[in-house]
Swiss-Prot record:
This is Photosystem II reaction center protein Z. It is a multi-pass membrane protein. One of its GO terms (cellular component) is photosystem II reaction center. It comes from Staurastrum punctulatum. PSII is composed of 1 copy each of membrane proteins PsbA, PsbB, PsbC, PsbD, PsbE, PsbF, PsbH, PsbI, PsbJ, PsbK, PsbL, PsbM, PsbT, PsbY, PsbZ, Psb30/Ycf12, at least 3 peripheral proteins of the oxygen-evolving complex and a large number of cofactors. It forms dimeric complexes. It is found in: Plastid, Chloroplast thylakoid membrane. Belongs to the PsbZ family. InterPro entries: PSII_PsbZ, PSII_PsbZ_sf.
Amino acid sequence: MTTLFQLSVFALIILSFLLVIGVPVVLASPDGWSTRKNTVFSGASLWIGLVFLVGILNSFIS
């Protein structure tokens, strides 16, 4: 259970880093938002899911 928690936290950190770098690049590029809108929304949805997963797993670890 601890390993699953650690992997989910690691995935959350990596995804957060990718979104912090990627979203401004997509918004700054010409015609980037209209072509990459689904990718940004998918990344944001995955991030929200990981936040809830980390919270749920944390309740089992603590």
